């Protein structure tokens, strides 16, 4: 009888050798994808402008993950922070990609070997002579090894004791670099934006995993617990493994979308909440105010704003602006950023400074409204000019730029003023090259958005998978109609009363 496509995994249900083979093949596929994807991204990645055309604007997905773990140089002679590199070393982007591909090939061969030589003595129960796995013991081994890896990452890789450290930056994503991180053992270690928490939590979790692994290797589960949780059933392993995966997927979806020390904005782009809360705008105004307090002119104060900080304060870098089903990188949407034009300051004919209301995240269009410092509407771009009271022409609005390429330039032509007012809705104004990539002008999401969507979606699917397989293994007797603990064959003649074990016939 042929199996339907959704039942094919039953062939490894009672076959430990081939169960191992398919898992090794799965590892080969994952490692092979990672290495191949890294090489593809390196082939299309342009490292020439890390400020206005960073990896997240170009839609890079695996390069940011390598970078946050300490890989910053390429055999192509460039570094992720700019400049040329003479000796990138073996653990460059290409070196890591190649290692994954070699590892994938070895796993591929190992999977084939274990598929062919499936009937190994190690998988045979000495008492019964049938294929069998000591699942509680295997659980202990896996827990111990995972604990060692977790502890090693936190104690050696992150701290720099034996490793490069991790990517660490300031709260505004301006000074990021790979550096050693000391564990944070105090309450500050629970702050998701404190890098020291990464080291301390991995050390603590790894220690717990090692101890728990040793416990499960040395202590057998009680019979009642073993039977109650179906510890001898491979589908129990599947169910609990799926639970671990969906839980991890939900966690990383949250740390990616809301931001954390593990997802620096220099590598994955800003979060939508930084736009919603005017996070970068407030920092820019704070710096300008500090400059003015030091007797700098408005032009000097704005000219000292880093272009990188101004670029974060642009709605096109908001991951929630791009539709989930708009394929392509951010550069394919609004174009490649070329330069900051400067900060526009609008004034009416009475000399009041006016502020353009910024577009909220989930609006595609938004009325152009200019308010004064008290929040009173002073000018707008009306829908119906016949009924307008605050049009740019009537109010006599002018615009002057401070900092950037248009520093010191002013305009009083209403058409030009309205053009820059519309663009000021989107945050700081940048010159964007749409010709190079034939960009269509429609916003795209960043890798932060794609990662979150993918992991949240799969976490939901895996959650239902956990419920499904957990129910199947816990209630196997109900679904199959067979009590797994029934040790006597229920047949006519075995008992005086059919099915009643208390009336078993005595053999004379």
UniProtKB/Swiss-Prot annotation:
<keyword id="KW-0150">Chloroplast</keyword>
<feature type="transmembrane region" description="Helical">
    <location>
        <begin position="457"/>
        <end position="472"/>
    </location>
</feature>
<keyword id="KW-1133">Transmembrane helix</keyword>
<keyword id="KW-0793">Thylakoid</keyword>
<feature type="transmembrane region" description="Helical">
    <location>
        <begin position="21"/>
        <end position="36"/>
    </location>
</feature>
<comment type="function">
    <text>One of the components of the core complex of photosystem II (PSII). It binds chlorophyll and helps catalyze the primary light-induced photochemical processes of PSII. PSII is a light-driven water:plastoquinone oxidoreductase, using light energy to abstract electrons from H(2)O, generating O(2) and a proton gradient subsequently used for ATP formation.</text>
</comment>
<keyword id="KW-0157">Chromophore</keyword>
<keyword id="KW-0934">Plastid</keyword>
<keyword id="KW-0812">Transmembrane</keyword>
<keyword id="KW-0472">Membrane</keyword>
<protein>
    <recommendedName>
        <fullName>Photosystem II CP47 reaction center protein</fullName>
    </recommendedName>
</protein>
<keyword id="KW-0602">Photosynthesis</keyword>
<feature type="transmembrane region" description="Helical">
    <location>
        <begin position="140"/>
        <end position="156"/>
    </location>
</feature>
<feature type="transmembrane region" description="Helical">
    <location>
        <begin position="101"/>
        <end position="115"/>
    </location>
</feature>
<comment type="subunit">
    <text>PSII is composed of 1 copy each of membrane proteins PsbA, PsbB, PsbC, PsbD, PsbE, PsbF, PsbH, PsbI, PsbJ, PsbK, PsbL, PsbM, PsbT, PsbX, PsbY, PsbZ, Psb30/Ycf12, at least 3 peripheral proteins of the oxygen-evolving complex and a large number of cofactors. It forms dimeric complexes.</text>
</comment>
<keyword id="KW-0148">Chlorophyll</keyword>
<dbReference type="GO" id="GO:0045156">
    <property type="term" value="F:electron transporter, transferring electrons within the cyclic electron transport pathway of photosynthesis activity"/>
</dbReference>
<comment type="similarity">
    <text>Belongs to the PsbB/PsbC family. PsbB subfamily.</text>
</comment>
<feature type="transmembrane region" description="Helical">
    <location>
        <begin position="237"/>
        <end position="252"/>
    </location>
</feature>
<dbReference type="InterPro" id="IPR000932">
    <property type="entry name" value="PS_antenna-like"/>
</dbReference>
<dbReference type="GO" id="GO:0016168">
    <property type="term" value="F:chlorophyll binding"/>
</dbReference>
<dbReference type="GO" id="GO:0009523">
    <property type="term" value="C:photosystem II"/>
</dbReference>
<feature type="transmembrane region" description="Helical">
    <location>
        <begin position="203"/>
        <end position="218"/>
    </location>
</feature>
<dbReference type="InterPro" id="IPR036001">
    <property type="entry name" value="PS_II_antenna-like_sf"/>
</dbReference>
<dbReference type="GO" id="GO:0009535">
    <property type="term" value="C:chloroplast thylakoid membrane"/>
</dbReference>
<dbReference type="GO" id="GO:0009772">
    <property type="term" value="P:photosynthetic electron transport in photosystem II"/>
</dbReference>
<keyword id="KW-0604">Photosystem II</keyword>
<dbReference type="Pfam" id="PF00421">
    <property type="entry name" value="PSII"/>
</dbReference>
<dbReference type="InterPro" id="IPR017486">
    <property type="entry name" value="PSII_PsbB"/>
</dbReference>
